[in-house]
Regions:
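Active-site acidic catalytic loop and adjacent metal/ATP-binding pocket
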Residues: 33-36, 75, 188-239
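ATP-dependent phospho-/nucleotidyl transfer catalytic cores
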Residues: 45-48, 133-208, 311-317
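ATP-binding pocket architecture of kinase catalytic cores
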Residues: 40-133
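Active-site activation/catalytic loop segments of kinase-like enzymes and analogous catalytic loops
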Residues: 239-272, 285-304
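ATP/Mg2+ or Mg2+-diphosphate-binding catalytic cores
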Residues: 291-335
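ATP-binding glycine-rich phosphate-binding loop
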Residues: 11-37
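A glycine-centered beta->alpha junction motif in the catalytic cores
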Residues: 92-105, 153-161, 245, 287-305
Length: 335
């Protein structure tokens, strides 16, 4: 037994008294622990967030639950009504344990369920504003600056590649211009009035953006799809989540337009997309996100052992380019 696990066993009584539970066993699981209790299985894990962030996430989850979206990992509260417990100076959160499988984006049925659950979550999140005194993380309106910065980094990395001339650099220089073209198209669309209108609409309506809608945070249990891992949630246009889902699915199916339609139809059936959202989604999907990420990680790590790995990853991105461009050519016909 590791020192970490033995410390958790030593904290059993503290957890029981804080949550008014009786724990029969504590088992390590992933980054936390499964607790068998007299109130069902629970999942305890350390949270790297600040106390204010936990309070905000708890507030957001309560709003979702109170507005009909109950398939999520709500925080259990202590007898003092706190959504966390402090153990040896560290903050821990307790949630119901959801025993299911992580979403397989390569599986159409899983991806469609993920789109449906996302729409239901966004619908329930409307009108959300945090309680007084709780700071709301806000990324609203920062997309243009963020992508512009990444565009500048792509240009800067081109100059770096011209100086270095290694295997990775040659591949980068061979393809960078066409990815720059995609980035410029993306920023051109974002510079239109649609994005500004979406920002104003989101500010007016309120809402919850998950901000980390990835496979490990989408749990399938029988016919029910649970959304977990809300620690990055905040105020942002809702299509940020939908674009993340689409991008992950598209990379699993060579940017197949009919499969994108499956997800868009599943989402829109509950939450129709506006013309402004369709335009801004196009801008976001155009941006060569993975190309930037792979190159950025390579030029900022420069560990010799990683060069082969990053070169392979870059080659994968280059191989994907034609399918990506073809998909973007079909994008407007999806709506």
């Amino acid at each position: 037994m590791s020192g970490r696990d033995s410390k958790m066993l030593e904290s059993k009584e503290l957890i029981e008294s804080a949550y008014d539970l009786r724990i029969s066993s504590i088992k390590p699981c992933r980054a936390g622990y499964i607790l068998d209790t007299d109130n069902g299985k629970k999942y305890l894990r350390q949270c790297q967030c600040s106390e204010n962030r936990i309070l905000f996430v708890h507030d957001a989850k309560q709003h979702l639950h109170n507005h009909g979206f109950v398939n999520l990992d709500t925080y259990c509260v202590t007898i003092d009504e706190h959504p966390f417990i402090e153990i040896e100076g560290q903050l821990f959160i307790l949630t119901p344990f959801i025993d299911g499988h992580e979403c397989e984006f390569g599986d159409d049925a899983d991806a469609v369920k993920a789109a449906q659950a996302l729409a239901a979550m966004h619908k329930a999140g409307k009108g959300f504003k945090p309680q007084n005194g709780i700071f709301m993380p806000n990324d609203l309106g920062k997309l243009t600056d963020s992508l512009s910065k990444r565009y500048d980094e792509i240009l800067r990395m081109r100059r770096k590649a011209e100086r270095e001339r290694g295997a990775f650099d040659y591949i980068y220089l061979n393809c960078v211009d066409k990815f720059i073209g995609l980035a410029e198209q993306s920023l051109g669309l974002l510079g239109g009035p649609e994005y500004q209108r979406l920002i104003k609409k989101t500010l007016l309506e309120g809402g919850i953006c998950h901000h980390d809608y990835s496979y490990q945070n989408i749990i399938m249990k029988g016919p029910i799809t649970y959304i977990t891992g809300f620690e990055s949630c905040g105020e942002e246009i809702r299509i940020y989540d939908l674009v993340n889902l689409l991008r992950r699915k598209m990379r699993k199916c060579n940017w197949n337009a009919p499969k994108a339609s499956l997800l868009l139809d599943a989402y829109s059936e509950l939450e129709p997309l506006s013309r402004d959202e369709i335009v801004v989604m196009k801008a976001m999907l155009l941006f060569p996100q993975k190309f930037w990420r792979v190159a950025n990680r390579y030029y900022n790590s420069r560990r010799s052992w990683a060069q082969k790995n990053f070169t392979g990853m870059l080659e994968e991105v280059v191989t994907e380019f034609t399918d990506h461009v073809h998909f973007m050519g079909q994008y407007d016909n999806l709506f």
